[in-house]
């Protein structure tokens, strides 16, 4: 899958005035590309509002991060559950009208989640780093910043907001990007969940090596359709290599009940990331407990 990047409009300075030069009109070819183009502009604007040095100063006084990977490895019930705090998505619109991230996070913690995932994209998922801050203040579980990371700046945003781990999506990053961002995340004490969707992406990640936490997204981010056989097919082909590298495998998206969890567990998944199935339930805590224990 090739996702084109479209950095913010270049700027030209004439005398003391600065102008943005518009790109030629062109449309993104799928939802993921649309998100990436918007994210490039968003990050550029964020840098101007909050300089990197400001984020660095905020991070200096923070306590150490929690061990996201260890929390999954040490789960008493397998597969371990990463429960997602998610208000909306591009494909489903608003998933939960009465969205209270603190109440949801507390219910997840009480219901047996090992870690939480928090959507920080505002434009397409109605999330935000402010939501991550709220959740961090409410619970002690390790937190994943679920973001479309394109720049090291976003890693500093995640750490400053209280994240313990970050998502890196192979489809939108080059091999060089993945390696550099992994090192930058480690320097900040952040675990990395690198996400793949197809054989080519998983092959890339395994060839790079050094990713102890790998996610297989059952959702095709170009169409947002889900298929649990994605995990099964990729694990059948690459399961031995994942085991040889000691990587923990997370199956993401399209998981709605215990039978789905058992299905991906049988394929080799060590953990699952579940969002919509829980967010649509009135009693989130009971729904999660039932999902974990059947």
Curated annotation (Swiss-Prot):
It is an enzyme of class 4 (lyase). The keyword Phosphoprotein does not apply. The keyword Lyase applies. CDD domains: IGPS. Signal peptide: none annotated. Keywords: Amino-acid biosynthesis, Aromatic amino acid biosynthesis, Decarboxylase, Lyase, Tryptophan biosynthesis. InterPro entries: Aldolase_TIM, Indole-3-glycerol_P_synth, Indole-3-glycerol_P_synth_dom, Indole-3-GlycerolPSynthase_CS, RibuloseP-bd_barrel. It catalyses: 1-(2-carboxyphenylamino)-1-deoxy-D-ribulose 5-phosphate + H(+) = (1S,2R)-1-C-(indol-3-yl)glycerol 3-phosphate + CO2 + H2O. GO terms for biological process: L-tryptophan biosynthetic process. Its EC number is 4.1.1.48. One of its GO terms (molecular function) is phosphoribosylanthranilate isomerase activity. It holds the Pfam family IGPS. Belongs to the TrpC family. PANTHER family: INDOLE-3-GLYCEROL-PHOSPHATE SYNTHASE (PTHR22854:SF2), TRYPTOPHAN BIOSYNTHESIS PROTEIN (PTHR22854). This is Indole-3-glycerol phosphate synthase. It comes from Parasynechococcus marenigrum (strain WH8102).
